[in-house]
Amino acid sequence: MQYSAGIIPFRINEENKMEFFVGHPGGKKWEKQDYWALLKGGVENDEDWLTTAIREFKEESSFSLDEYNKKSFIPLGSVIQNPRKIVVAFGIYCPHIIESECYSNIADNGLNPEIDRYRWMTYDVLKEKTHKKHLIFYEKLIELENEYKNNK
């Protein structure tokens, strides 16, 4: 079984709606698809889930989450994405990520970035563009929306 861990940064936008920071995979396979996902990647060596998620987020966005206390990350559980892969996710309130300042490492083939575009999206938009098995992660964060609206 393959394991991946990822981070879902979120914020409350000017319309008072929760938005999630997601990426569009790079490469020929994805260039014509309107698919967006949390930034995630494989667990290496003896890493714990959160360490993997933080490392992968930085590799795929160039944005460091090192300033955040590990207790600030919200465990969102895991899903079986397919018969060979389990995905674990964490949320973090992180409203100051700027899409245009993000860039990704280069994928295994050396030709394309792992992530070629970044966006903040509301759940209503994202639910049509992401992996259906990942929706539970975003739904768990939406349950906390009022708590963050009050602290905006």
Each model region followed by its residue ranges:
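Charged phosphate-binding loop/patch that engages nucleotide di/tri-phosphates or the phosphate backbone
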Residues: E128-K152
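N-terminal strand-loop-strand
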Residues: M1-L38, F90
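Alpha-helical structural elements
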Residues: A5, E15, P25, E31, ...
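A periodicity- and composition-biased signal for non-globular, repetitive helical segments
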Residues: W30-E31, D46, E139, N146
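A generic secondary-structure boundary signal that marks alpha-helix termini
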Residues: N16, S62-F63, N150
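Unchanged
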Residues: W36, G41-I136
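Intrinsic low-complexity, intrinsically disordered segments enriched in polar/basic residues
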Residues: M1, N109-N112, N146-K152
